[in-house]
Amino acid sequence: MPKYYEEKEEEKHPCGGVKEDLKNCLLQSDCVLQEGKSPKECLKEGYCKALQVTFFECKRSILDNRARFRGRKGY
């Protein structure tokens, strides 16, 4: 289950939960903790790729007129 659901209020921003999970994934990755790299560098190297794709799809679905009827992608 995504971590942002536990003991939190409803997000006001679209895709906020996916963004928070992506941030937590990057900050808890070995790339940041052990190698001391920035989260941006780790994202370029491919860490948390699934959440990155989910966040991109969610942001894209906001702009896609067809997806407005179907609802946003993501959680």
Curated annotation (Swiss-Prot):
The keyword Transcription does not apply. It comes from the Eukaryota. GO terms for biological process: mitochondrial cytochrome c oxidase assembly. The keyword Disulfide bond applies. A motif (Cx9C motif) lies at residues 48-58. PROSITE patterns: CHCH. One of its GO terms (cellular component) is mitochondrion. Residues 28-66 form the CHCH domain. Transmembrane segments: none annotated. Pfam families: Pet191_N (PF10203). A motif (Cx10C motif) lies at residues 31-42. Signal peptide: none annotated. Disulfide bonds join C31-C58, C42-C48. Involved in an early step of the mitochondrial complex IV assembly process. Belongs to the PET191 family. PANTHER family: CYTOCHROME C OXIDASE ASSEMBLY FACTOR 5. This is Cytochrome c oxidase assembly factor 5. It comes from Xenopus laevis (African clawed frog). The gene is coa5.
